[in-house]
Each structure stands twice: as structure tokens, then as C-alpha cells.
């Protein structure tokens, strides 16, 4: 079953799903802006198109991830994003 989610006054939208190949995941699009997300469990983020400028927990330097790049976020933490253009992503819940 698909589950639609909307965050930050509609600037971030995602569709959650579960599949045998991916497990529990969501795909979504983020509009330009700055966002902070909290995690309940570890997440693996893959940039599908566009770019994410990310500040991960425990780091002081922002890093840019572009289409095809993957990064991991620990559970029970938060991470910060700066988005300069509409960007799509796949988030797998580990």
C-alpha cells in the first residue's frame, strides 16, 4: 500500500511503500529551501535527480550529494539539508 506524506507546508512530498527488493522506503521530491529532518531509525538516502547539500550528525562540514550518490543517517538523530533546485530522492529505512 502507498502512503502519501507532506512536510514543510508542501515543499517536501513523499510516497512510502514496501517492496521485496527495497524493503520499507519512500520516494519524494524536495523544493528549494532549508530543512531539518529527524530519524527514528537508520536511513539510507539516494539522490535520484538534483542535488542535496547535507550536514550529517556529528559533522561540521556540509557535503553536496548529486544524482546517484548515497549517504547514511544514524537512527535517533537529525540532519540538515539545503536544496537549491527541486531534488528527488529514495529513502530506505534500515
Curated annotation (Swiss-Prot):
Which InterPro entries does the UniProt entry name for this protein?
A: Ppnp (IPR009664), RmlC-like_jellyroll (IPR014710), RmlC_Cupin_sf (IPR011051)
Q: Give the Enzyme Commission number.
A: 2.4.2.1, 2.4.2.2
The record's Gene Ontology cellular component field reads:
cytosol
What would be the name of the gene that encodes this protein? ppnP
Does Disulfide bond appear among the keywords? no
In Pfam terms, one family for this protein is Ppnp
State the Gene Ontology terms under molecular function: guanosine phosphorylase activity; purine-nucleoside phosphorylase activity; thymidine phosphorylase activity; uridine phosphorylase activity
Per its database record, what is this protein's job?
Catalyzes the phosphorolysis of diverse nucleosides, yielding D-ribose 1-phosphate and the respective free bases. Can use uridine, adenosine, guanosine, cytidine, thymidine, inosine and xanthosine as substrates. Also catalyzes the reverse reactions.
Q: What is this protein called?
A: Pyrimidine/purine nucleoside phosphorylase
Catalytic reaction list: a purine D-ribonucleoside + phosphate = a purine nucleobase + alpha-D-ribose 1-phosphate; adenosine + phosphate = alpha-D-ribose 1-phosphate + adenine; cytidine + phosphate = cytosine + alpha-D-ribose 1-phosphate; guanosine + phosphate = alpha-D-ribose 1-phosphate + guanine
- Member of which family? Belongs to the nucleoside phosphorylase PpnP family.
Q: Report the SUPFAM superfamilies cross-referenced here.
A: RmlC-like cupins
What CDD domains does this protein map onto? cupin_PpnP-like
Which key words tag this protein in UniProt? Glycosyltransferase, Transferase
